[in-house]
């Protein structure tokens, strides 16, 4: 019992130590009673003492809980794989409806509570940012890898042994992909179009596959920059902007060789709205009198002082405008403000001006027309002026005015203009276009292909089953399980188009066992039949496929390593701390980013 101190930690007492095979009974004391985190008799294992309000799962229970949560997430997106995929209708927090079959878009809208499920959602986001495609496949594969580990956990096989087998299988799977891949010529436009169309063929916009693939390829080829060292940079996210304007039809979508943004000139009546071969000046400084960083008090005793103050402001703005006029630009675009006095000066000189443009758009214009963003007007050089644009024009589309800086000579930035009947359709087309541009970028950077339609997965699975015989010890079980897990992709493709799954997969497995020449056979996602992907023309980029294998297997390994899940109401609150009447949720800095009730 407690000593004289009253609040000291009660030490765990062992009972029945003389009895053979008996284990000591340990008593836990909560931190709220004044205990410390650790306690224990000499020679005994220390006892972790936690808040009574906290929930804790350890050992096999934690592992199975993680696997169940991950499998539940993968089952959500399983029906969205392949050309016969189903759509998901999601109602987001703002009340708007999202219709999509994109794995990342679905999981982004779902609010999950389990930490393992959250890690699966992050997995999809990581895949999307890394290669732009394969978000659904990576979730399905990760869930299946974890599901295949359950029998080994039931047999009390240590997670480290399972992980060792999994990682060994991953190394061999990548090596097999290296053997299976087909190199293509970098300038083979037809082959590149077929690959991107195969990606778009699984999306909502299948009917417009050719249109979207053409848009994606044009955008990627426009922003492609050859680096001095021999490599190439293709920054689609930064330099290929997608502008959605409701109205018209999808056939009106096009890639603009330049930049489009929703702005009008500052003084429409006095500034020209169309300029051929414009000289463009880009600024990152305000053309209005800059207020002091700190609060400034000016004491004015007579009217002349006030007039002098206004004159000083006008002189400052006048000096800046004169610096600009000396450079003889036709169009001035600034990221900051533009005062009425400056507008008068510029309009009198016949210069069009646009203010408060986003920095990202300004950088895009600089890259498209060869300009340099200037930070001070007294530092403007003639080389800073962009002369590469063909035309600047302001057009009214619907109720909004849009500025076009297009027909650039050598644009390294572009805008994809999307038109469509409604915002929902435009949002889905944008998601599909993002995936298509990711695929096109991957092929241009790494021109190697792997057969699609589950052919690569089945070929790797067959080879892993053969190699498993040479793996020593119990590691061979999880090694073989990776091969079995990879078959989930062709199985899901067959399932989603209503084919007899068992019969189809058995035939495909037998076909792949025939050896050379049979490794390109997979599932036709439209009919559910077994066909040669080489003849069908369904290919996937090597970068996407190998990244899918790596990401899914490493995520499965990460979740298998977890043997303890501790979650409480609050990090700071002790036992019995009362919750507020209207609790609010905060993400905090918890290890699993779980939502917590504020104190």
Regions found by a protein language model. Name each.
Residues 82, 132, 156, 216, ...:
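Residue-level signature of catalytic and energy-coupling elements of molecular machines
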Residues 64, 111-113, 412-599:
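Extended, low-charge hydrophobic alpha-helical regions
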């Amino acid at each position: 019992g407690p000593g004289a101190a009253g609040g000291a930690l009660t030490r765990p007492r062992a009972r029945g130590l003389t009895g053979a095979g008996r284990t000591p009974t340990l008593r836990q004391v909560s931190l709220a009673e004044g205990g410390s985190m650790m306690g224990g008799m000499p020679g005994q294992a220390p006892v972790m003492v936690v808040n009574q309000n906290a929930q804790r799962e350890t050992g096999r229970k934690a592992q199975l809980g993680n696997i169940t949560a991950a499998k539940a997430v993968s089952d959500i997106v399983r029906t969205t794989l392949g050309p016969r995929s189903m759509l998901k209708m999601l109602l987001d927090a703002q009340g708007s409806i999202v219709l999509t079959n994109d794995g990342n878009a679905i999981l982004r809208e779902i609010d999950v509570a389990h930490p393992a499920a959250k890690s699966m959602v992050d997995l999809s986001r990581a895949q999307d940012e890394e290669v732009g495609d394969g978000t659904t496949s990576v979730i399905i594969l990760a869930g299946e890898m974890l599901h295949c580990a359950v029998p080994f956990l039931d047999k009390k096989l240590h997670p480290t042994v399972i992980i060792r087998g999994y990682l060994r299988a991953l190394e061999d799977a990548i090596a097999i992909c290296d053997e299976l891949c087909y190199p293509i010529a970098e300038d083979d436009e037809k082959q590149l179009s077929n690959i991107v169309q195969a990606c778009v063929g699984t999306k909502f916009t299948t009917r417009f596959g050719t249109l979207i693939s053409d848009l994606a390829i044009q955008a990627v080829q426009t922003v492609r920059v050859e680096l001095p060292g021999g490599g190439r940079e293709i920054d689609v996210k930064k330099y290929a902007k997608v502008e959605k304007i409701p109205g018209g039809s999808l056939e009106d979508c096009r890639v603009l060789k330049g930049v489009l943004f929703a702005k009008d000139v500052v003084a429409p009546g006095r500034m020209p709205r169309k300029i051929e071969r414009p000289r463009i000046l880009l600024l990152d400084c305000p053309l209005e009198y800059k207020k002091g960083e700190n609060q400034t008090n000016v004491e004015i005793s007579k009217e002349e002082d006030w007039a002098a103050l206004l004159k000083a402001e006008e002189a400052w703005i006048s000096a800046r405008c004169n610096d600009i006029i000396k450079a003889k630009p036709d169009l001035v675009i600034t990221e900051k403000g533009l005062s009425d006095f400056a507008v008068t000066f510029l309009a009198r000189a016949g210069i069009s001006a646009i203010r408060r443009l986003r920095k990202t758009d300004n950088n895009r214009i600089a890259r498209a027309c060869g300009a340099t963003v200037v930070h001070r007007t007294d530092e403007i050089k003639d080389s800073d002026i962009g002369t590469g644009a063909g035309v600047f024009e302001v057009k009214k589309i619907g109720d909004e005015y849009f500025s076009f800086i297009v027909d650039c000579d050598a644009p390294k930035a572009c805008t994809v203009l999307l038109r469509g009947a409604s915002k929902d359709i435009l949002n889905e087309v944008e998601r599909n276009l993002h995936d298509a541009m990711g695929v096109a970028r991957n092929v241009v950077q790494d021109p190697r292909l792997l057969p699609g339609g589950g052919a690569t997965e089945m070929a790797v699975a067959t080879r892993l089953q053969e190699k498993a015989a040479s793996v020593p010890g119990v590691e061979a079980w999880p090694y073989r399980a990776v091969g079995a897990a990879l078959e989930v992709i062709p199985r899901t493709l067959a399932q989603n188009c209503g084919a007899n799954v068992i019969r189809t997969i058995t035939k495909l497995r037998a076909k792949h066992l025939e050896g050379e020449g049979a490794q390109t056979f997979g599932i036709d996602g439209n009919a559910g039949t077994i066909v040669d992907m080489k003849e069908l023309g369904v290919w996937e980029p090597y970068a996407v496929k190998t990244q899918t294998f790596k990401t899914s297997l490493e995520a499965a390994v990460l979740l298998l390593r977890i043997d303890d899940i501790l979650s409480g109401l609050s990090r700071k609150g002790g036992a019995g701390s009362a919750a507020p009447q209207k609790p609010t949720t905060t993400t905090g800095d918890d290890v699993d980013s779980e939502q917590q009730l504020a104190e």
